[in-house]
């Protein structure tokens, strides 16, 4: 009994009075986490007695349960388990998280009824195993409220050393909530949310990763018209972009050829303790968060969703459009959650003026390279709830169909040489074949006809003629990515446990002759909560006052 009493009060002291022997240098972070509760607990004898009674009742119930089940667990083993559990629950770090978006689904085909899904950049330092913990969500409508536990799914590469990673918080709530909150230790923070899209311009959505200091208008026009030709709809996220290019994209949006979405920087309005800059310490600038956001927006209305970069162009070689191409693969393998296309590097010649833009000449002068890259996914949104950059890290790879007879055209480089419009027209040949062309002649004619039709619009033509490819920020960003990831990973053979792929430390000089549009918003910091304080932004808008930054 003496050992029992001593161990019990060890646990009580650990939970309630860490100023005793447990409060030393090695356990200082534990002390700091519960110091807020310590004083009120010691000054309230009734609360102390209540805790002891509840604790003893729990021990008694546990022992009786073991006896009834004829399990030979000793009191020492039981208390050892309780002690380890207490230690595990208390050894967390106070961290911060940024909520990029939250959605409520009244009746989702895949998430269920009254489902909630939040995309959050979370710190891996919060818990030893982030996914083993739950988040309490409170949904309210009038005088009704419902508390539920939500799960955490982390989409990141194995052994990722970046402090912040993309996490999907998923749970259920009451019907048609007026308010959603996250609760911890009696403190709540209200979370802005919206419903997913109820319609789509196309059953095929091509999600384009967030753009920053984007200036290569030639890439954008190629991809916009190719996606449009094959029946897809582009959804593109923008952090910053050269203003003249942005103005042209807005015209395409008015034509319903694409949808532009905000991708604002994650900033913390206020904190009571030092915290690392999330944008500088998140994997790939939170690209997985943007792609998962696109998935959650369209998952109830799209049949297929693709995750591409702006320099990824897919031409369906054996079908007339994307829907036909993707349907043929998924119909043949109905249990598969996604299809996966590899990438082939190509070089294209530069076009200085939009007056010279021509798909037939661009493809005729295309240089197909031997080098390939890791590909991208097209998913069935009913079987996909979250994704990493190339594919989900949570779904079985043996249910991802790898397409072998078609490759994504990856525009690796726009050459310094000007597009030669006097060169003879010929179709580019698929690498490794002698006669199979990358694209059909009829498709090139259709692409050029579509572009010329758009170009005849006087509003479009006036804006498009102002576009200039400065080629100023692109080399800077390329070198930054090379120094921060590509060289360490591919040349020095370092893995993700040693490097955090992120280019936010790039120094981007400002030029008077280059103006950029930048996404921005109203930043909100919730009340300090343990173990996680939440932050977010509302009322996003486009700003031309920030400059050309990430």
Curated annotation (Swiss-Prot):
It comes from the Eukaryota. Its main location: membrane. Keywords: Glycosyltransferase, Membrane, Transferase, Transmembrane, Transmembrane helix. Its EC number is 2.4.1.-. The keyword Plastid does not apply. Pfam families: Glyco_transf_92. Residues 203-487 form the GT92 domain. It is found in: Membrane. GO terms for cellular component: membrane. It is a single-pass membrane protein. Belongs to the glycosyltransferase 92 family. This is Glycosyltransferase family 92 protein R07B7.12.
